[in-house]
Protein backbone atom coordinates (compact mmCIF):
# COMPACT_ATOMS: atom_id res chain seq x y z
CA UNK A 1 0.00 0.00 0.00
CA UNK A 2 1.11 3.52 -0.74
CA UNK A 3 -1.33 5.34 1.54
CA UNK A 4 -2.41 3.61 4.78
CA UNK A 5 -5.65 5.61 4.81
CA UNK A 6 -6.63 4.19 1.41
CA UNK A 7 -6.69 0.38 1.10
CA UNK A 8 -6.98 0.68 -2.69
CA UNK A 9 -3.68 2.56 -2.99
CA UNK A 10 -1.19 0.16 -4.50
CA UNK A 11 2.17 0.30 -6.21
CA UNK A 12 1.48 -1.83 -9.33
CA UNK A 13 5.12 -2.96 -9.43
CA UNK A 14 4.74 -4.47 -5.95
CA UNK A 15 1.13 -5.65 -6.21
CA UNK A 16 0.97 -9.36 -5.44
CA UNK A 17 -2.29 -9.60 -7.36
CA UNK A 18 -1.21 -7.69 -10.46
CA UNK A 19 -1.04 -10.42 -13.11
CA UNK A 20 1.92 -8.68 -14.71
CA UNK A 21 3.93 -9.70 -11.62
CA UNK A 22 2.78 -13.33 -11.50
CA UNK A 23 2.23 -15.96 -10.37
CA UNK A 24 4.63 -17.55 -10.90
CA UNK A 25 6.71 -14.85 -9.19
CA UNK A 26 10.28 -14.21 -10.29
CA UNK A 27 12.89 -14.34 -7.51
CA UNK A 28 13.66 -10.63 -8.09
CA UNK A 29 10.00 -9.75 -7.57
CA UNK A 30 9.84 -11.71 -4.31
CA UNK A 31 12.94 -9.91 -3.00
CA UNK A 32 11.53 -6.47 -3.90
CA UNK A 33 8.12 -7.42 -2.55
CA UNK A 34 9.57 -8.56 0.80
CA UNK A 35 11.60 -5.35 1.00
CA UNK A 36 8.40 -3.41 0.33
CA UNK A 37 6.57 -5.28 3.09
CA UNK A 38 9.36 -4.52 5.57
CA UNK A 39 9.44 -0.86 4.52
CA UNK A 40 5.67 -0.62 5.02
CA UNK A 41 5.99 -2.16 8.47
CA UNK A 42 8.69 0.36 9.41
CA UNK A 43 6.57 3.26 8.10
CA UNK A 44 3.62 2.16 10.22
CA UNK A 45 5.93 1.80 13.24
CA UNK A 46 7.34 5.31 12.77
CA UNK A 47 3.83 6.72 12.52
CA UNK A 48 2.67 4.70 15.55
CA UNK A 49 5.51 6.04 17.70
CA UNK A 50 4.78 9.64 16.69
CA UNK A 51 1.04 9.17 17.08
CA UNK A 52 1.43 7.56 20.51
CA UNK A 53 3.46 10.54 21.70
CA UNK A 54 0.83 12.89 20.27
CA UNK A 55 -2.20 11.20 21.85
CA UNK A 56 -0.43 10.74 25.19
CA UNK A 57 0.30 14.47 25.25
CA UNK A 58 -3.44 15.01 24.79
CA UNK A 59 -4.24 12.75 27.76
CA UNK A 60 -5.00 9.50 25.93
CA UNK A 61 -3.22 6.22 26.65
CA UNK A 62 -3.64 4.71 23.16
CA UNK A 63 -5.81 4.78 20.04
CA UNK A 64 -7.19 2.30 17.58
CA UNK A 65 -6.36 2.15 13.88
CA UNK A 66 -6.62 -0.25 10.97
CA UNK A 67 -3.98 -2.02 8.90
CA UNK A 68 -5.40 -3.21 5.60
CA UNK A 69 -4.27 -5.89 3.14
CA UNK A 70 -2.30 -8.21 5.41
CA UNK A 71 -3.11 -11.51 3.67
CA UNK A 72 -0.10 -10.97 1.48
CA UNK A 73 2.44 -13.80 1.49
CA UNK A 74 3.49 -14.72 -2.07
CA UNK A 75 3.69 -18.38 -1.01
CA UNK A 76 -0.08 -18.34 -0.45
CA UNK A 77 -0.61 -17.48 -4.11
CA UNK A 78 2.28 -19.21 -5.86
CA UNK A 79 2.66 -22.91 -4.94
CA UNK A 80 6.00 -23.08 -6.76
CA UNK A 81 7.47 -21.02 -3.92
CA UNK A 82 8.29 -23.60 -1.28
CA UNK A 83 6.28 -26.48 -2.78
CA UNK A 84 4.24 -28.53 -0.31
CA UNK A 85 0.95 -30.43 -0.37
CA UNK A 86 -0.99 -27.24 0.36
CA UNK A 87 -3.82 -26.22 -1.98
CA UNK A 88 -2.78 -23.58 -4.49
CA UNK A 89 -4.02 -20.00 -4.11
CA UNK A 90 -5.47 -20.43 -0.63
CA UNK A 91 -4.91 -18.95 2.83
CA UNK A 92 -6.69 -19.33 6.18
CA UNK A 93 -9.27 -16.78 5.08
CA UNK A 94 -9.93 -18.28 1.64
CA UNK A 95 -8.67 -17.04 -1.73
CA UNK A 96 -5.80 -14.63 -0.97
CA UNK A 97 -6.87 -11.80 -3.30
CA UNK A 98 -10.33 -11.72 -1.69
CA UNK A 99 -8.93 -12.09 1.82
CA UNK A 100 -6.38 -9.36 1.17
CA UNK A 101 -9.10 -6.94 0.11
CA UNK A 102 -11.49 -7.81 2.94
CA UNK A 103 -11.83 -6.36 6.44
CA UNK A 104 -10.73 -9.63 8.04
CA UNK A 105 -6.98 -9.17 7.82
CA UNK A 106 -4.47 -10.41 10.35
CA UNK A 107 -4.08 -7.53 12.79
CA UNK A 108 -6.47 -5.36 10.77
CA UNK A 109 -8.00 -3.83 13.89
CA UNK A 110 -5.22 -2.83 16.25
CA UNK A 111 -3.99 -0.07 18.53
CA UNK A 112 -0.75 1.87 18.62
CA UNK A 113 0.55 -0.10 21.60
CA UNK A 114 -0.63 -3.39 20.14
CA UNK A 115 1.14 -2.64 16.86
CA UNK A 116 4.38 -1.80 18.63
CA UNK A 117 4.10 -4.80 20.93
CA UNK A 118 2.97 -7.41 18.43
CA UNK A 119 3.45 -6.47 14.79
CA UNK A 120 6.34 -4.01 14.53
CA UNK A 121 9.45 -5.64 13.07
CA UNK A 122 11.69 -3.26 15.01
CA UNK A 123 9.90 -3.15 18.39
CA UNK A 124 7.77 -6.26 18.99
CA UNK A 125 9.16 -9.10 21.09
CA UNK A 126 6.59 -11.60 19.82
CA UNK A 127 8.75 -13.14 17.10
CA UNK A 128 9.96 -16.50 18.33
CA UNK A 129 13.38 -16.62 16.68
CA UNK A 130 15.21 -14.18 18.97
CA UNK A 131 14.07 -16.13 22.03
CA UNK A 132 14.35 -19.73 20.88
CA UNK A 133 18.03 -19.97 21.80
CA UNK A 134 16.85 -19.87 25.43
CA UNK A 135 14.83 -23.06 24.90
CA UNK A 136 17.25 -25.76 26.02
CA UNK A 137 14.83 -28.53 26.99
CA UNK A 138 14.16 -31.34 24.48
CA UNK A 139 12.02 -29.98 21.66
CA UNK A 140 9.92 -31.37 18.83
CA UNK A 141 8.90 -29.18 15.89
CA UNK A 142 6.01 -30.54 13.82
CA UNK A 143 5.32 -29.12 10.36
CA UNK A 144 1.97 -29.62 8.62
CA UNK A 145 2.74 -30.24 4.95
CA UNK A 146 -0.61 -28.91 3.73
CA UNK A 147 -0.56 -25.72 5.81
CA UNK A 148 -1.61 -22.64 3.83
CA UNK A 149 0.06 -20.13 6.14
CA UNK A 150 3.03 -21.76 7.87
CA UNK A 151 5.63 -23.18 5.53
CA UNK A 152 8.52 -25.65 5.85
CA UNK A 153 11.09 -22.85 6.02
CA UNK A 154 9.17 -21.38 8.99
CA UNK A 155 9.37 -24.71 10.83
CA UNK A 156 13.03 -25.04 9.85
CA UNK A 157 13.87 -21.58 11.20
CA UNK A 158 12.21 -22.48 14.50
CA UNK A 159 14.13 -25.75 14.63
CA UNK A 160 17.45 -24.12 13.74
CA UNK A 161 17.00 -21.34 16.32
CA UNK A 162 16.26 -23.68 19.24
CA UNK A 163 18.98 -23.79 21.88
CA UNK A 164 18.23 -27.43 22.68
CA UNK A 165 20.81 -30.03 21.74
CA UNK A 166 18.06 -32.67 21.80
CA UNK A 167 15.69 -31.46 19.12
CA UNK A 168 13.67 -33.22 16.44
CA UNK A 169 11.60 -32.31 13.43
CA UNK A 170 8.62 -34.12 11.93
CA UNK A 171 6.34 -33.46 8.96
CA UNK A 172 2.74 -34.65 8.90
CA UNK A 173 0.38 -34.63 5.92
CA UNK A 174 -2.08 -32.14 7.41
CA UNK A 175 -3.59 -28.69 7.16
CA UNK A 176 -2.87 -25.90 9.67
CA UNK A 177 -5.35 -27.22 12.25
CA UNK A 178 -4.73 -30.93 11.56
CA UNK A 179 -8.39 -31.30 10.57
CA UNK A 180 -8.00 -33.78 7.74
CA UNK A 181 -8.80 -37.43 8.55
CA UNK A 182 -6.11 -39.13 10.62
CA UNK A 183 -3.96 -36.01 11.00
CA UNK A 184 -4.59 -35.44 14.69
CA UNK A 185 -4.00 -39.10 15.44
CA UNK A 186 -0.74 -38.94 13.49
CA UNK A 187 0.23 -35.83 15.42
CA UNK A 188 -0.58 -37.48 18.77
CA UNK A 189 1.32 -40.62 17.79
CA UNK A 190 4.33 -38.57 16.71
CA UNK A 191 4.38 -36.70 20.02
CA UNK A 192 3.85 -39.88 22.06
CA UNK A 193 6.64 -41.73 20.27
CA UNK A 194 9.00 -38.78 20.65
CA UNK A 195 8.17 -38.33 24.35
CA UNK A 196 8.40 -42.05 25.16
CA UNK A 197 12.05 -42.04 24.07
CA UNK A 198 12.85 -39.27 26.54
CA UNK A 199 10.68 -39.81 29.61
How would you label these PLM feature ranges?
Residues 172-199:
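Catalytic active-site module of serine/aspartate enzymes centered on a nucleophile-bearing elbow/loop
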Residues 135, 141-143, 147:
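Short beta-strand/loop motif that positions the catalytic acidic residue
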Residues 155-159:
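Short, highly selective alpha-helical patches that border small-molecule cofactor pockets
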Residues 148-154:
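Conserved alpha/beta-hydrolase "acid-adjacent" motif
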Residues 2-130:
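Alpha/beta-hydrolase
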Residues 132-136, 161-164:
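Short, conserved loop/helix-junction motifs that constitute active-site signature segments
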Residues 119-120, 139, 190:
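A cross-kingdom marker for long, charged
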